[in-house]
Amino acid sequence: MKKVTTLLSTLALATTLAAQNLPQTERQYLSGHGCDDMVEWDFFCTDGRNSGKWTKIGVPSCWELQGFGTYQYGITFYGKPFPKGVADEKGMYKYEFEVPEKFRGKQVNLVFEASMTDTEVKVNGRKVGSKHQGAFYRFSYNVTDFLKYGKKNLLEVTVAKESENASVNLAERRADYWNFGGIFRPVFLEVKPAVNLRHIAIDAKMDGTFRANCYTNISNDGMSIRTQILDKKGKKITETTVPVKAGGDWTSLQLNVSNPALWTAETPNLYKAQFSLLDKAGKVLHSETENFGFRTIEVRESDGLYINGVRINVRGVNRHSFRPESGRTLSKEKNIEDVLLMKGMNMNSVRLSHYPADPEFLEACDSLGLYVMDELGGWHGKYDTPTGVRLIEGMIERDVNHPSIIWWSNGNEKGWNTELDGEFHKYDPQKRPVIHPQGNFSGFETMHYRSYGESQNYMRLPEIFMPTEFLHGLYDGGHGAGLYDYWEMMRKHPRCIGGFLWVLADEGVKRVDMDGFIDNQGNFGADGIVGPHHEKEGSYYTIKQLWSPVQIMNTSIDKQFDGKFSVENRYDYLNLNTCRFLWKQVKFPLATDASNAAIQVLKEGEVQGSDVVAHSAGILDIKTNILPNADALFLTAIDPYGHELWRWTFPVNKLNQQTEQLSPLSSRPAYTETENELTVKANKRAFIFSKKDGQLKGVSVDNRKINFANGPRFIGARRADRSLDQFYNHDDEKAKEKDRTYSEFPDAAVFTKLDVKEDGGNLVVTANYKLGNLDKAQWTINPSGELALDYTYNFSGVVDLMGIRFDYPEDQVISKRWLGAGPYRVWQNRIHGTQYDVWENDYNDPIPGETFTYPEFKGYFGDVSWMNIQTKEGTISLTNETPDAYIGVYQPRDGRDRLLYTLPESGISVLNVIPPVRNKVNSTDLCGPSSQPKWVNGPQTGRVIFRFM
């Protein structure tokens, strides 16, 4: 056996060495590979910053990010091809490079991966070809006869930021994204043998059928093409050799692989195809290797999209190629980061909005597993037909062999030229579906930003519903807010296959002319699930939970839990037994424990997933019973590649809070009265109650004042006008202006009296009210100085925010620590994505769209057992004993433009109702059942325990 193993290893090594010695395509980079290794070229900018002089610039780059020219956001000049005032500087580049003598006699192409926008190229003073127009596409020139071999050569490039072609400007530059200028993707020499394989287009089906069209630059008598299929270990599986027809420019070949490992987003199995062009003596003239995957795409009318015979659900997002410091110029590492970011949210699809991405991004999608919609530019304007024909050919020739690409997109939102629809399949032997985003075409209805109710109507149409943009993000709105309702509707409907959220990340530019300020152009670029540097916002985790392919259906467990969970396997292909599950039984610290008290892990284990096939439900048995002293069970699902899908937390014991142990001689609470106040003292603490309104007016600990006061007060609010929904006020001309403003209900309660009585060792202070919302606030003060507040208020009607509140000066707050859902705040329509655990964060108050500190300190927090707020004056501790109540920590801040909400000040609050949040396009009530206001009728009660330290 050892001899066989050694022989196989030797043969594999020999094959590898032989492949290395084949005449293959070489690359000599003239620029860097991306933003991380730019190469300096000489540069002259004609206008704007640092213009009018020769200097240096890194290539590839967007010149604005290197300190040149003028920043320009595209939508400013929407619909105008040649407007006055548009930034239209040009950049002139020079670069000297050596070409080795060994390249003589070979074909040398000068390749630009992309340049914005019109690009003219000279080598050694001679123009090498026609001006290129179209910013996001690879283009090249055969410069074989322009070069000096073994000597230095001069490359000169002139790039115009604005195109001379009106259709290019309208398609690419009058759009809702940043316009840049420059050679923003790599430049290299592509060196091939004089007789070579020019291009290869592969079609590999799920049944193992492999077809390829091989294009050669020359077809001589006796030439042939040998094709070998290699598995992921480099082992040859099969091969074939076919003759090349003399005088033809392409050759078709076919072979078969038995039982191939199929490519899907869940199983991204890749193969290699090695193509060798042979002369009539069998000598290899040129060899090319392509990665590919076996998979079959099928669109079934009025049914769905099938990959390898399985109907898939699209869990997707739109993605720009972008970073704040480098604009559209990325690197291999940053492209992989983007794919991992999406996979981390359990997404399986991405739309390349609104242009083709870097090749490295597609390679990452191939190897890590994402379904891709590859898009021709055209935001609202469209390319003229000759330009579009040329760009489509280049786009598909570059991208055709990526198994991750499932759809081609002909522009965006009527930015499609219908004369181009037939061009895609001319170059794609796989005949992938062609999409019109926001349109109805090729069996797909892709309408954008429909409300929840409108989406239901679209699903009644015969076409497959797949919105290529939905739940438009803005600051903390959209994305995860409303996603639960949308997704439950979408995944269950027989004619909906999912869709693409807008958008992955904020497009905020780091302005080198504004001391590094991140410029999102107000609300235009602030649409991301994550911030410009991929700072994770609350919706990131909502999406991660809701789109997890493994769903635990239990909502709670108790002490009698037997270890069995109901589970749904929402994978399209994988069995649940390919996943692992880690569990822990834990004990949480109490509110009264030290601030650094940690969670105790009492017991932990791991189980393999049970045998539950894709698209089905079953039982997951983790084979453990709950320990008597356990507070909660953590359960984490791990996918076959070692990535966490989600962690569920199941509390089994809402904590019985311990009070300070006092000796029998401990002093009972005592009180004193004046005309206006009642002061209660217990355990070095003093509490002042007003006799005019019954509210707590002041707290001190050991004569140290804590300005927690003015409560409880009833707070209730609703959106001032329910514009665009069922409450729209047609008689109010300013109704639309009010649909984001929340107005408080005035509480007409009249204070009647303050009662004081002793109850055992405690003192009970009761404030009574009539004729309004607040009915009663009963304070029980025990000898340790704890206050238990039992309150009752009444409300009847529609409400978006409701509960009780207290005041505390925000500028005194340092941090908070709590046991509850976290670490992010929640909205009524974005409850998912948090986990019950101990969390803490320092005070922050980021301005949405401008500063990016997460999780936000302020907002509404769910399922809180206790919360300790550390201040400059001391600690305010709340233990919540009101079922289903939320703790409010001030009110969330909106962006400067107040496009989402203007919420009333709510201080420190205990809330029975919290507001939902809208998205950029749809008003709040249009986002689904979870976004509706609450109808409340009758008394509401609650209990909360306060400790001051």
Where are these regions (language model features)?
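Extended carbohydrate-recognition surfaces in non-catalytic/accessory domains of CAZymes
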Residues: 20-111, 163-176, 180-183, 534-535, ...
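Substrate-binding/catalytic cleft of secreted carbohydrate-active enzymes
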Residues: 211, 339-342, 349-538, 542, ...
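Extended acidic/polar, glycine-enriched regions
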Residues: 148-152, 215-300, 627-673
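Substrate-binding clefts and catalytic carboxylate motifs of secreted carbohydrate-active enzymes
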Residues: 33-53, 57-59, 63-66, 88, ...
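Accessory beta-strand-rich segments of carbohydrate-active enzymes
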Residues: 22-23, 44-46, 88-197, 219-221, ...
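Beta-strand/loop-rich accessory regions of lumenal/periplasmic or secreted enzymes
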Residues: 114, 159-161, 264, 626-629, ...
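Active-site-adjacent substrate/metal-binding segments within catalytic domains
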Residues: 66-99, 103-123, 129-132, 190-203, ...
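Beta-strand-rich binding/interaction modules
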Residues: 121-123, 209-244, 251, 273-275, ...
